[in-house]
Amino acid sequence: MKRGEIWTVAGAKDYAGKPRPALILQDDRIDATESITICVMTTDPAEAPLFRVPIAPNERNGLNRLSRLMVDKITTVAKNKLGHRVGHLDVKDMERVDQSILIFLGLGG
């Protein structure tokens, strides 16, 4: 599991309860824990540009329809709640996600 990869997640609490894709946010160097920090996705078209980063489906990310990363729903789950690897975000999409997280957490200056 590497930062920027998309995995399926299910069986965790709250927003990761039903099966859905999730982006790995945790730094690759922090891998000795039994948990991992993720950002779950939704296909709900709710307009919230700062908190819902749209990700268009493509071959690299493995998504089959437009999804939105819910940066206001960052959570940590047990690694055994992750299913299979779906794909990986490209650099530009990761930069958009990182920027949205910085703003949401008040770290954007």
Placement of each model-derived feature along the sequence:
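Conserved functional hotspots at enzyme active or ligand-binding sites that engage polyanionic ligands
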Residues: 1-109
